Structure formats: C-alpha cells, structure tokens
Amino acid sequence: RIKPFSDMEKQAVSEGMLPFPENEEELYFGLKVIAADGRSALIPALKPERRALLESDLNRILHGLNEERKVKIGVFSPRLPFSPDGKGSAFASLAALLQEYYEVFEIPAGSSLVPQDISVVLALDPGRLPPVFAYALDQYVMRGGKVVFLVDPYSEVRHALQGYPPRPDAEMGEYLKTWGIDYHAERVAGDVLRGERVKGGDGRYRVYPLWFWAKGEDGRPLRFHTPGSLLAAENFADLHFSELAATGGQSGDIAAEKIRYASKTQVILDYNQDNKKRVLALLAEGKFRSHYRGGILDKAKSAQPYLPFAVRDAAVAVVADSDFAADELWVASRDPENPVYGIVPYAGNAAFLLGLIDRLSGRAVVPPSVSPEAPGAANIAETLYLKSAEKLREEKEKFDAKEAASSARLRRLKKSLTDSEDVSRRREIERAENENRRDRKALQNLERQIAAAADDRLELFVWLCFVVFPSGMLGLFFATAFFVRRRVRRQMMTLEKEK
C-alpha cells in the first residue's frame, strides 16, 4: 500500500504503474523488467484475472528484451478497421497485442510490393484482392513469404459496420485454390454439440449452431461465429498440410445466402446436420506455384521480378472466420489505460493467432501453459452466477463504466499533481477520491446482489436435486410398489377362486 501524495506514489505513477482499488485504499502492483543494456518492459498492473497468463507474459517480455529488433509483420485489412494503435476498431485488443510484440507495418491496398523483410503478412477479411496487390502477395510467397488469411463467408463484424448483410467472397476461394487450399466460401459451418445458447424472439433459449466452440491442435478452446470450412486439395505433392482447428465429428452447415436476412430461429430450422468434421483453420507449407504465367508488373520499379515457382519454402495459413480476431469473440474485459496487460481473455483466439505468427516467423516463444476454458467446462455454480449476472448486465455495465471513468479522472489528477499545487487542487483530488470510493461501493453492492441471487439459485437447485427430486422418486417408487403388490394379490385371489 502507498500513502496518497507520497514520494513513493509519485514514483509509481512516473514509472507508469496503474493503481487498482482494494477496499478503500489503492494498491500499486505492477512489474518492470530491466535488461542489462538498459532497455525495459512494464506490466502497469498485475491483474488477478490474468494470473494464469503471467508465465506467458513474462516469457514474452524476456524474449522481447533479448531480441535485437522486433519481428516485422504486415497487416492488410482493406474492409475492416484495424489500426496498429488499436483505436476505434472491433479488433482493438489484437491490434494492441501486435503493436506490443511486433513491429507492425500497415500494407496499403494498392501496394505493388510486399517487402521481404516482413516476416508474416496478416490479411484480415481481404475480400477480392486488388490485382496489383494480388500479384505482389503472390511474388512475396514465391520468395518464401508467410501469409495468414482470415477469410469469412459471412462476417458479422462487417455486417455491423456496413449496415447490411455481406455476400460470400467467392474470389478468395479461387485465389487460395491455386495454393492447395479449398475454401468453401458459399457455406457456413456449425456444430450443434458445441453451439452456444441464444435467446430467441419468443424468449426461449435455443442452441445456435453457427456460434460454437472448437479446439485447436494444442487443445486450446477457440470461439467461432459463422465460419466457413477448408479442405486440403489433392495433387499438391510439394506441400505439407496441418489442421490447426476443426469442428467435432457431428457438425453441419448451411448456405451463406440463407442466413443473410433470416432470423436465428429460421437458421436453426434450415441448418443441415450431416455429422462430418469440418476444418476451420489450415496451414500449408512448402513450395507453391504462382497464380500468374508472366510478370504483370515488370515495368513497375517497385515490383519484384517474376518467379513462376517458389524458390524457397513458404507458408500459407487460413482461418475461415475473420470475426475470430474480434474482441467480442475472446475478450471478457479490457482496460483502455492498460491495453495489453489489462486484457482478460475468455477464449484462446488471440493466443492462437500470436502463436501462429510466432511459428511462421521462427520466433521461439513458449505458449502459455494455461489457457482459458470454454464455457462448456463451467461448473454449476459458475453457470448460475452467469445467469444471475445476465439479468443485471446493463446495470453492471453502467456502474463499470462510471467507476472506470472516475478512476481514470483520479489518476489523471494525481499524475499532474506537483509539490507546488495549491490547496484547491488537492481538494479537487479529495473530491475525486470520494466520488471514486462511492462508485466502487455501488459496484461492490451490485456484485454482492448478483452473488446473492446466484446463491439463492444454487440453494434452490440443491433443494430440488437432493430433497424434492429424491423424495418424489421415493414416493413414486412406493406408490408403484403398492399398486403392483395390490394387483398381484388380486390376481392370486382370482386364481384361488377359480380353483
């Protein structure tokens, strides 16, 4: 604990540490790692919710301090906002992580050259590639480049952004086919057994098969929304294929066109269950062949000379869901003032993508030993708590936002405070502290209310399971035994009379 306005607090703030409230006091509990050459890395606040990821965080920090320079990656996202600073984007959390761990280079749509010093290109929902860039990317791969495509037959993020349902991108299917990957852009994959329960217009909860959980090759739980499916094409002897993620063995699909204006209830009715596994993420490695028979940009000064075949091993990975990277599919909470180490994930989507980029770039970063569990692994108490929290979700979000705003205001005031400040400034800080304390108490009261509601549900569940249900079954058993015995006695009496 640090006393307010003390030299220790000023030092913590100047180092970039962020406080978090504990009862009515503020704690500064961060971590700064300093390398021998003077370079440093900072975790502004060690959040208890991220304790399972601490080993991974420290490993990445130490690995980064040992690197002479960051690995350079390129981001190509012509249709979805994905700025490296992570602002104003549905992918803000992933953008912040990429900015922290790599040197991020944004690739313009009209680029005629993808520099070979870019270790990995991340193409997010590229759609129909501009002809010039398509050639540049092709020649980048011919020279041993690595590309990660996030494609989508029905991007819900793009739907929300443009205001109308998107159409499938058949062009990407043709582009990827030349590199040995069959992308089924016209159909959306689903999994009923791992699907999420959603509330319909009639108030009833149903399993929506197009929103589901899957597991990666390392067992990490991954969340998908309306993904496509992939298949390794035949007759590509120079390529090695690896399945990175797939549905279970009892999956199905639906035509992408059918879900554009349909309700979730109608989608459930039209869904085709065929009990076949579908690959959701696929990696192809080896020597690829070019899409082109000649150099279409030979006269351009910036373009690479044409190569018909790859001169060294390259890699192309495809994830058939661009929404896979969006915050909504893997972020439980996020602290805007701590954009990297304030992210609390509930799914392994970002860890999957970071691990894939590390794998392709040759970065030997050890994956986290502990990954978030899928909701299906939650126990009864957690499930009841989530149901109670859902009823008070809007109220809790309001209190969360209010408490975060008052905490941010208080930190700004403290950070700008100097020894020469007058009494009125200190009183302003005291008022901000009192306001923040009231907001925290209101938030704590609401959390206690949620917990109490969950306890009541749990008590009712226990009463039903261990008292009412067993008593009912016991009563039914005795009643059945009584009527069976009486029937047998009547039959015996009837037989005696007949004798």
Question: What are the language-model segments listed below?
Answer:
Residues 59-70, 250-499:
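Extracellular ligand-binding/catalytic regions of CAZymes and related secreted enzymes
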Residues 8, 17, 142, 172, ...:
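Detector for methionine-enriched segments
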Residues 24-31, 64, 137-144, 322, ...:
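Short, functional N-terminal and low-complexity linear motifs
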